[in-house]
Amino acid sequence: MRVGLVFGGNTTECDVSKSSASGIRGALQKLGHEIVDIEFDKDIPLHILDANVDVIYNSMHGQYGEDGRLQGLLDIMQIPYTHSGCLASALAMNKQLCNNLFKGARIKTIKGFTVSKERLQNDLWKEDWKNSEIANKTELFCKPVCDGSSVDTFLIENANEFSFKEITLHTKSKDFLIEERIHGREIQVAVLGREPEAVGMLEVKPNGEFYDYKAKYSENGAIHCDVEAGEEVKHAMLETAVKIHNLIGLKDISRSEFLLTKDEEFYVLEVNSHPGFTQTSIIPEIAAKAGIKYEEIVEMLLKNASYGG
């Protein structure tokens, strides 16, 4: 099969995309496919037409490749592509929309509010905080509504003293989500397959205050370990990850992130429709423990590639 491998782009997650593409390229070669590298830029429609491929393997992360825009283009061009479709990708990218859906499905989320990037940078977010349901909480997390890899994610230890005025923000997200900080362990659950199944989970223990961009992509930034918790709560998180996958309308692959408290209550942090896919990323690590090889996931995604979904 002639496969167009799309990666890169002028986004905060360009380097992550290229790292994923490197591993995927090796897997495609092992599987015997013909590979055409397609680096994302403003002329992407022409690059895709010129490549004359049977299918697009989407190795993009973040804006354009993960938020439904590349998917919409490929739907119009009627070229099959991997991962989720246009609408599901757009929904999964927007943390606030996801939270609204989760609440409607009675899946626990962390309390918070949204604020524009402009209000954030001018410290007007404090007015919104004082009028929010978390006005009595001073320890908060702030993250872009539409971005990934913990880009521009901040731990606010004291909301009364914290200022964004001197902080340079790199995200293109127009809005931010500010939530109360709940102490707990971060649990990652992998969902794979056309008939979605939660294949396993792991706990992430960052070496810093939280699982930020540096912890995710630096050597020794975090430790991955088995989840030590009661069987009932582990089973509940696995079931909830599949429920989230189906609720958003995701396809073939997703990673749900949960916060597990010492009382074994869990909250969904977010869902990722296009999880990192280097050889050492979380999804391949969980899959390997379940006896699923990296190349098998790549082949499954190619086999299930489609457009218009």
Where are these regions (language model features)?
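Zn-dependent metallopeptidase/amidohydrolase metal-coordination segment
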Residues: 278-282
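Conserved metal-phosphate-binding beta-hairpin within the catalytic cores
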Residues: 180, 191, 246-277, 287
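Hydrophobic beta-strand scaffold residues
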Residues: 35, 80-81, 109, 140, ...
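Active-site "cap" helix and flanking loop/linker of ATP-utilizing ligase/carboxylase catalytic domains
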Residues: 203-254, 285-309
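Active-site nucleotide/adenylate-binding loops and adjacent lid/helix of ATP-dependent enzymes
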Residues: 1-6, 91-179, 183-184
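ATP-binding N-terminal substructure of ATP-dependent carboxylate-amine bond-forming enzymes
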Residues: 1-100, 116-128, 300, 304-309
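Phosphate-binding site of ATP-dependent enzymes
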Residues: 157-239, 262-267
